[in-house]
Amino acid sequence: MTFDRDVILLDDLSSSIKNPKSRLYESNIGYIEVYEPKEIEKSLELIQSRLENGIHAVCCFSYNLGLVFQGLPPKASLLNSPLIRAWFFKEYRKLSATEVDEWIESRLDLERTQQAEIDGGIVDVNFEIDEKTFCENIDSIHSEIRKGETYQVNYTFNITGKTYGSTIGLYKRLRQRQRCRYGALICCEGNRILSFSPEL
């Protein structure tokens, strides 16, 4: 997938000209990856130290990190992914929703001049579980809620596939089709992460 420059966009659709909330980070000055549980504490201390010295950090924490904190075995399907990823920047720009739209279009225009494929998409989609397992798991969650064992479960499973074309083109398509308040576009140090969520 094409993208010629390190960039992170933390997108907030409620952002306005009077109250710009979206953040655009460019030109990162450092990056760390953590795979081993024994490195977690030292890495968190490093992140905190940089924050205290006026450096901005954007971090991605794996679901497996939560399991490590609870003393539970990590999820096998996530073993090859970092527990922590953190990118560091000297500054960022605040953008309104309109300015984010304009920034996306300017990036796509740049890709057009480079004769890159600006359409982005996903093919060969595979679900980690089948429909029967999904329904059984949801029934089990409903049962636990009825018994008062829990009041809410954020149920997730992996969906894998292959992407093609422009990373930002794919982000634009998903942003239009999956309208929710928050989004993230991370294109740094070879990482390509696109995320959408109704809550922070």
Ranges and model annotations:
Residues 1-200:
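Extended alpha-helical targeting/anchoring segments
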